[in-house]
Amino acid sequence: MSGNSLGKLFCVTSFGESHGPAIGCVVDGCPPGMPISTQEIQVELDRRKPGTSRHVTQRREPDEVEILSGVFEGVTTGTPIALLIRNQDQRSRDYGNIAETFRPGHADYAYWQKYGIRDHRGGGRSSARETAVRVAAGAIARKWLNQQYGVVIRGFMSQLGPIEIPFVDWDEVGRNPFFAPNASIVPALEDYMDELRKSGDSVGARIDVVASGVPVGWGEPVYDRLDADIAYAMMGINAVKGVEIGAGFSSVAQRGTEHSDEMTPEGFLSNNAGGVLGGISTGQDILVSMAVKPTSSIRLDRRSIDKQGDAVVINTHGRHDPCVGIRATPIAEAMLAIVLMDHALRHRAQCGDVSCATPKLARLAPSGVQRVPAPPR
C-alpha cells in the first residue's frame, strides 16, 4: 500500500490499523534544536481522543504517545522522529458480522476490490483511528511554526447536520465537546445529538480552520500550490468530502468587484482568497473549510452485498461516532500545520535570501472585513 506519506521537506509517514497493536508515524525533516516533550504532544492528542463525551465513540483509548527516536534530552536532533500510540481498547468481536459483507458508504468494498484482502476489524487502515498520529505529528509542526514565525492555528465547528453555528468567540471553542465557537447554541447541539444517537443514525459536520501569522511567499505557483496542498491534505482525512479555501464555492455567486480583495496602504480590505493567491500565501489569514460526511457505520438496517455478490441486509454494532466531525477539528488543525511547515522549509531553502522593496501589507486594514476573526495570539 503506497500513499502513506505527506510532505517533501517535512514528511510524515503513518502506519498501523484500528485494531492492531499500535499506530504510529515517522516525522522526517524537523530541524534540530527545538525543545519538544510527550506532554506537549499529549495536549493535542487529548483534544481528539475518544470517549471524552457522550456524543462520540465510547472506545476508551488513552492515546498516550511515546517518542522512540529523533529527540535527545528533550530537544529534536534533526533525525527522524518516531511516534507510537498503543491501541488498548479494541473490541474486534463487534465486527464479526461484517467480515464477509460490505458496509454501505464505507471503504470496505473499495479496499476488497483493490487489494483482495482487508482487515474488517474496526475498518483496519481506513479507520479514523489513524488520525491520532497525524495530530501527534501536527503538534510538532505547530510548535515549530509558532516559534519560528508566530503562526497560530485554530479550528472550530461551523455546522452540525442542519444546525449552522455562527462564530462568536474563540474562547468558547475549548469549553464544549463540539469545538463550537458559540456557547448559546451548545444546548441545541446536545439535544440534536441525543436524539440522533437514540435513532441509531449519523450526521455530518463542517469544520473551519484559520492559520494566522503565515508570512507572504509560502507555496509554489503551479503543481505544488499552497492551497492545492492544503486541500490535498484535508481530503486525506477520513470522511472529508469537500474542501473550501476562502470564499470557496460561494465565490461562484460573487462578482469580481466583490470577490477580488482590494489593497490599500493600510492593508487588504477583504479575504475572499483565503490567504492564498496564485498558489502563494499573501500574508493574510489562511481560511480553510471542510465538509465531513455522516458516519458510515450505523446500527440501522442497510442493503448491501456479501463477498459472493449476493444481496444482504446489514447493520453495524460497535462503538462508533454518530458524527465523526465532532472530533475532526484537532485533526484539521494538525494537517494544516503539517502542510504549512513543509512549505515553510521549502520556501526557506529556495527563497530564504530574497528581499523585496515593496512593503508587506497588513493582513487586514482597519476597515477590512473577514468572516472569521484571527485566532488570539
UniProtKB/Swiss-Prot annotation:
It catalyses: 5-O-(1-carboxyvinyl)-3-phosphoshikimate = chorismate + phosphate. Keywords: Amino-acid biosynthesis, Aromatic amino acid biosynthesis, FAD, Flavoprotein, FMN, Lyase, NADP. Reduced FMN (FMNH(2)). Pfam families: Chorismate_synt. Gene3D superfamilies: Chorismate synthase AroC (3.60.150.10). Its EC number is 4.2.3.5. Its cofactor is FMNH2. It is an enzyme of class 4 (lyase). Pathway: Metabolic intermediate biosynthesis; chorismate biosynthesis; chorismate from D-erythrose 4-phosphate and phosphoenolpyruvate: step 7/7. GO terms for molecular function: chorismate synthase activity; FMN binding. SUPFAM superfamilies: Chorismate synthase, AroC. NADP(+) binds at R48, R54. GO terms for biological process: amino acid biosynthetic process; aromatic amino acid family biosynthetic process; chorismate biosynthetic process. FMN binds at R125, S126, S127, N238, A239, G278, K293, P294, T295, S296, S297, R319. GO terms for cellular component: cytosol. HAMAP family: Chorismate_synth. Belongs to the chorismate synthase family. Homotetramer. This reaction introduces a second double bond into the aromatic ring system. This is Chorismate synthase.
